[in-house]
Amino acid sequence: MANTFKLKTKANVGITTQNVYVVPSATTTVVIGITLANTSGAGCLVGVGITRPSSDDVKVLKNVPIPQGSSLEFMSGNKVVLEAADTLTINSDTNNSIDASLTIMEIT
């Protein structure tokens, strides 16, 4: 089994929920860290979710405020394990307001 560290990014996330990362087939992924930066001119509320093929979708963050010009480092030593076809999603209450960085390790 190979372990590969990767960085996934998504710029200008807004009101429409965006898929930041979809786990490839035959892969398990460990989410090591998520950083959300507010690039808008005002504060905004963000959400992070996990969509699963089994329809057990969950919110990991919901309506968490990020002040103007600030960022939120989400995970702080915790890990989340994602399985094949799981999707990590992000949204905001303000259009084009969030840049997201996702640090992961894929196990193939």
Where are these regions (language model features)?
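Polar, enzyme-active/binding microenvironments
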Residues: 38-64, 89-97
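Residues that cap or initiate secondary-structure elements
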Residues: 27, 40-42, 54-56, 70, ...
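Intrinsically disordered, low-complexity Pro/Gly/Ser/Thr-rich segments with frequent PxxP/GP/PP motifs
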Residues: 53-87
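C-terminal interaction-tip segments
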Residues: 1-33, 91-108
